[in-house]
Design a protein with these regions (language model features):
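Membrane-cytosol interface segments
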Residues: 1-97, 326-329, 334, 338-353
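Histidine- and acidic-residue-rich, metal-dependent catalytic cores
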Residues: 32, 75-353
Length: 353
């Protein structure tokens, strides 16, 4: 299985992973042979990357950190929570805790965990998919930092609902893809306060989750919002969710900006150490996120093009590459593989989309 830009899809390509709608329903199932109308529809939905199966990469296994069932349930949970608040009802905190404990269970079950899967997002599911991805990444970081089960639960709840306050904002603002005006930006920043007010009144939820919603845009240097907290005044759980949110926003389209590839996002995160986020948190993050996700196509300094087939978790910037295309564009049949930990003179120069 490999990643393919929707713009490079061809009729006859076989979908390698199911694409879901905002409520967790299947839009297009794994194993479907793509037709031109299907490809056109994917473009209309705003999906930029999909996974395909082919003979050259059929042995490449790209596993999600959480099960497909738990990802669907989490999408449903955040949608139902948002809708409940939107119509003036209480969100079901017990259901949210059940959902995040399933995610925690998946994360704790894996001995060595590494995030190497790219989301397939459409315009209609990107808000909920973002919340789920932030929850998964925050839980991975929480486990790596040695948090106990109760604290992990508070972290995961706060991560899944970190943007719940946006339901109190105008729909057209939340759905806007262009850059915010200064006035819109000030209004948007209020989602942190709204989120805190929504969650702090839920007795079944740990108050730490409410503080995550309030503080997830605060930065170590005091230049965040809404209260410009800094240093020791920031809660570590909010910093974890803040970093997960920051990274996920970098690798996905947002208001006024286009997504960047994971290795560029990792470089930006690296530069945020001791400025936006603590050094310890950034180092932990970089040990658990693939700069070059498995299945992506890369170009090497040798001029060759290949697929990332596996990760070297001790050195995430130097994965294992299977060469598919020579420098003159001639296709190979598994001509060779580079383990970049061993081939020290070979390195990746770019991701090919």
């Amino acid at each position: 299985m490999r990643q393919v830009s929707v713009n490079r899809l061809q009729k006859g390509d076989v979908l390698g992973r199911t694409i879901f709608s905002h409520n967790g329903r299947s839009l297009l199932g794994k194993g479907v042979t793509l037709t031109q109308p299907y490809i056109d529809r994917l473009k209309e939905l705003g999906i930029s990357i999909v996974y395909v199966d082919d003979d050259e990469t059929k042995d490449i296994v790209i596993e999600d950190v959480i099960s497909e069932e738990n990802r669907r349930e989490a999408m449903n949970s955040i949608e139902h929570s948002a809708e409940a608040v939107r119509i003036g009802k209480d969100l079901n905190g017990f259901q949210v805790k059940k959902t995040v404990n399933n995610i925690i269970g998946d994360v704790l079950f894996q001995e060595k965990i590494f995030l190497s899967l790219t989301d397939m997002r459409s315009y209609d599911n990107q808000v909920y998919a973002h919340s789920v991805s932030v929850c998964v990444l925050a839980t991975i970081l929480g486990k790596a930092l040695g948090l106990d089960k109760d604290t992990l639960e508070a972290l995961a709840v706060g991560a899944l609902l970190h943007d719940i306050g946006t339901v109190k904002l105008p729909n057209e603002l939340v759905a806007k893809r262009e850059a915010f005006t200064p006035k819109e930006n000030d209004l948007y920043k209020m989602h942190t306060v709204h989120g805190f007010e929504i969650l702090r009144n839920k007795p079944e939820l740990n108050l730490l989750s409410a503080h995550i919603a309030l503080q997830h845009h605060e930065w170590l240097n005091g230049n965040g919002y809404p209260r410009k907290l800094s240093g020791r005044h920031l809660h570590v759980l909010a910093q974890i969710v803040g970093l997960a949110d920051f990274y996920d926003n970098l690798v996905n389209d947002g208001p006024g900006h286009s997504r960047i590839v994971p290795h560029e996002a990792c470089e930006i995160v690296m530069g945020c150490a001791n400025k936006l986020f603590s050094q310890q948190l950034v180092v932990t993050f970089l040990k658990h996120v693939a700069a070059y996700p498995t299945g992506c196509t890369v170009k090497l300094n040798t001029g060759e093009v290949g697929i990332v087939v596996d990760q070297n978790k001790s050195l995430p910037m130097r994965p294992i590459i299977r060469i598919l295309i020579a420098d003159k564009g001639l296709a190979h049949v598994r001509a060779k593989e580079y383990n970049l930990v061993e081939d020290l003179t070979t390195f990746i120069v770019s991701i090919v989309e």
